[in-house]
């Protein structure tokens, strides 16, 4: 009976030694160096993901038709050019990066299709005066992965600046240029994508402005498209108002933790 405390002390000492050795091995690795097998984001355990906004918090951060003006209202359905132009242009594009972009515009899914990166909230609005349509999404994911998508988008004016497509007997010209977004959030990128029917006798050019902004581990993305030129005022208002609301939703979310 007198030996039990001593045995317990030895066991505790051995445990402390093992923990200390593990800590030293971890300290020996450079910061940011992964240990073990590197897995895809979808394979990582949920504990590795940052805390996401609740659905209610994400919905509260959405923009509304009232933010953009009297001509705007909740959408009544997908615009006709979504299938007639975007989908067929994507099907006729051989260049991988360009097709990926057109697919992302068609599905409104800029940040990937994994369940972990699924949008937390979405909104779709129509401009009844011009026929423009604005789709808006809020996504929660790892900041590094969000930045990876932003970096890819930023390369597209160079890698997919001008490409021809042909599908369903129609030849189209796709152009991707940089668009300067408002100075909001932690990181941001903007693009203007135009798709033109090369045989059209009248102006039938589809123009889609794309904005993506990261704020911490959350991001907002919007596409603003029309057969013509999207309103720069509406795009800017949606971006700035949305960023302010998302920032406030994040602040309130942290305060409730």
What are these regions (language model features)?
Residues 1-10:
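N-terminal export and membrane-targeting signals
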Residues 7, 14-61, 92-93, 248-257:
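N-terminal low-complexity, Pro/Thr-rich disordered segments
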Residues 47-91:
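N-terminal leader/capping segments at the start of a protein or of a new domain
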Residues 52-54, 134-141, 225-232:
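Second-shell loop/turn segments in exported
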Residues 59-65, 69, 147-154, 236-239, ...:
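Extracytoplasmic/secreted envelope proteins and their assembly/folding machinery
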Residues 66-72, 76, 157-164, 242, ...:
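Sec/Tat-exported extracytoplasmic proteins
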Residues 75-202:
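A small/polar (G/S/T-enriched), proline-flanked helix-loop surface module common
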Residues 175-240:
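A short, solvent-exposed beta-edge/loop patch
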């Amino acid at each position: 009976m007198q030996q039990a405390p001593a045995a317990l002390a030895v066991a505790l000492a051995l445990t402390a030694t093992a923990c200390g050795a593990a800590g030293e091995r971890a300290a020996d690795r450079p910061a940011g160096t992964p240990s073990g097998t590197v897995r895809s984001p979808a394979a990582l355990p949920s504990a590795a993901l940052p805390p996401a906004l609740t659905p209610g918090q994400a919905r509260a951060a959405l923009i509304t038709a009232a933010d953009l003006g009297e001509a705007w209202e909740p959408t009544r359905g997908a615009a006709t050019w979504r299938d007639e132009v975007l989908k067929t242009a994507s099907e006729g594009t051989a260049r991988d990066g360009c097709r990926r972009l057109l697919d992302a515009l068609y599905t409104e899914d800029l940040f990937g299709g994994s369940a972990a990166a699924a949008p937390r909230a979405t909104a779709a609005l129509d401009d009844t005066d011009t026929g423009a349509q604005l789709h808006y999404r809020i996504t929660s994911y790892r900041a590094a992965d969000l930045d990876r998508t932003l970096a890819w988008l930023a390369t597209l004016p160079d890698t997919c600046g001008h490409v021809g497509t042909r599908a369903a007997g129609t030849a189209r010209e796709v152009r991707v240029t940089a668009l300067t977004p408002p100075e909001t959030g932690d990181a941001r990128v903007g693009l203007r994508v135009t798709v033109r029917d090369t045989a059209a006798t009248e102006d039938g050019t589809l123009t889609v402005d794309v904005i993506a902004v990261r704020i911490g581990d959350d991001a907002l993305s919007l596409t603003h498209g029309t057969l013509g030129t999207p309103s720069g005022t509406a795009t800017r208002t949606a971006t700035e108002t949305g960023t302010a609301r998302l920032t406030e939703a994040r602040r309130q979310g942290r305060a409730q933790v």
